[in-house]
Amino acid sequence: MVHLTGEEKAAVTGLWSKVNVDEVGGEALGRLLVVYPWTQRFFDSFGDLSTPDAVMNNPKVKAHGKKVLNSFSEGLKNLDNLKGTFVKLSELHCDKLHVDPENFKLLGNVLVCVLAHHFGKEFTPQVQAAYQKVVAGVANALAHKYH
């Protein structure tokens, strides 16, 4: 559960309504893989991830980034029940994929950076604070199965 004020919820949903999930998703996942290269081990089937350009232009990275942000969008619709929303993804990432749950935090922080880059002055410190709460809540929900 993420505790947001009415103003914070409005800021998050208002900005999110302007997000191009295809573009931002691919960029966020791509940046995660470039900035934290050890995360690439979970994406062996994605082909060439040998250089930053290869990662950022990889169609499988872009497609999976879109999928990730579509799931994030579902979380935004269910802020009062994030653990329930992400229970199956938590089980998948824990039991089958064995993803270190710290990676969820890293991706959340990268997403915040990408949003700041895309929205500039519109991404005020107040908007950032609200998004930091949301990505922390999503990361916690995704890590729930690990506890």
From Swiss-Prot:
Expression sites by tissue: Red blood cells.
GO BP annotations, alphabetical order: hydrogen peroxide catabolic process
Disulfide bonds: none
Pfam families: Globin
GO CC annotations, alphabetized: blood microparticle; haptoglobin-hemoglobin complex; hemoglobin complex
InterPro entries, per database record: Globin (IPR000971), Globin-like_sf (IPR009050), Globin/Proto (IPR012292), Hemoglobin_b (IPR002337), Hemoglobin_oxygen_transport (IPR050056)
Alphabetized UniProt keyword annotations: Heme, Iron, Metal-binding, Oxygen transport, Transport
Keyword Metal-binding part of the UniProt annotation: yes
Residues given in the record as heme b binding sites: H64, H93
One MF term in the entry's GO annotations: organic acid binding
Globin domain residues: 3-147
Protein family according to the UniProt entry: Belongs to the globin family.
Subunit (UniProt): Heterotetramer of two delta chains and two alpha chains.
Name of the protein in its database record: Hemoglobin subunit delta
Organism annotation: Ailuropoda melanoleuca (Giant panda)
Gene label: HBD
